[in-house]
Amino acid sequence: EIGFLPENPYFYKHLTGAETLKFYGKLCGIRGKKLKARVAELLEIVGLEDAAKRRLDGYSKGMLQRIGLAQSLVQNPRLVILDEPTAGVDPVGSREIRDLILRLKEEGYTVFLCSHLLEQVQEVCDRVGIIFEGRMRREGKLEELIKIEKQTAMTLENASPELLAKIEGLVASEEGAAIVETGHPRTTLERLFIQIAERRSKEKASAEKKEEAL
């Protein structure tokens, strides 16, 4: 029911990519043709078909992370837990892993992602929890967390300078201009995390001053 990719997975480097997946498949009770088909499917999903017969000691960091992601899916789990899946991976490899996570979402997997790379989290997650000093500080839908309250953004299409000069409240269509989008402008998860951390630091400093005053 659960697949897991730790931050620093350990693999037997003398095994090939295909042999590694077969090994974990057998640990999960998969055998025969079903296992062979599943290994081929996973290698295709993570883009390692051409490296299937290559030993892991010849894999790059990004390739090792992808084979790790494949092993977490070997038993077709309902929940996949990924702990820092792009740790030590170059930007290209990181983007490939991000795309893999998005593909898993599209295929119906539930992915629990733990990462310090908040930009990456913002790209792939629907719901987010922010932990600071060992406690959950904020949790909820991504769009709700990062929107900036009491501000409204408006995007216009084909708006003339004259129309822009007249905008004060309600925007009316003129010469083909149309309201494309209205809503709250967005912050980023990184800025939100920093705000939470700074707020927490101020609260601690205030509490310490009160204790000193007693």
Predicted regions and their residues:
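ABC transporter nucleotide-binding domains
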Residues: 1-113, 118-132, 136-138
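Short coil/turn segments
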Residues: 10, 68, 157-159, 185
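Conserved beta-strand-loop-alpha-helix hinge in the C-terminal portion
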Residues: 135-156
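C-terminal coupling/interaction segments
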Residues: 164-214
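Short phosphate-engaging motifs
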Residues: 120, 137, 162-163, 189
